[in-house]
Amino acid sequence: MSHQWADCERAFIAARYDRIAGLIGFIDWLFFVPRHFRAHAVKRLGLRPGQRVLEIGCGTGRNFPYLRAAVGPQGRIYGVDLSDGMLAKARALCGRERWTNIELAQEDAAEYMAPEPLDAVLFGLSYNTMPHHLAVLHHALKQLRPGGRIVIMDGKVPSGLGGKFILPFGLWLMRHTMLGNPLIKPWQHLAAVADHFEMEQFVFGSWYVCWGSKPTGAQMGALPYASERLIAAE
């Protein structure tokens, strides 16, 4: 489905997030982001000390405390974001906390290459804000080790009359803040290319965490066709 913000240029998206970088805490409150949502999503990554994780759309680093606790000081965290304003706040956070194992990059996530194979990838409230989300997901899969896990945490429109009632306001609010599209179905995209897919919903279906693993062994042959499978799921 096409929406008026789906063709936003990178510069426009980056500029919008530069402007709202100081408001992310307020926006979490405005959208009723569940209190333990971020910690729960990171838990679903199944990270162990010393592992390597990439957060796509890392923003101001609000997930970094949970990621750092999971991988420890010997692990490695990579964060990529289009917005310099967001990354400036993330760098400041890392400086205050003296986290030296977090590497940040201002780049399109569909082009960013982590310097080493990844154990896990997190889309932290970012998947539905990227017009080219399918390309980003496919690119993330290529960087993930076999058996590595991808987690997508995001918001969606609840089913039923409640969802229909709040949809017009939700779309208006997204256009004026995060530029996201809550009508896409990332869980279908991930389920099309991942093993052991699971999904949980929160706050009457307004928020979800879904996860799955990159296929291993004999199933690896399916991965060259991931692009086609993703398009079919769209």
Which ranges hold each PLM region?
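C-terminal alpha-helical "lid/dimerization" subdomain adjacent to the S-adenosyl-L-methionine
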Residues: 8-11, 30-31, 151-208
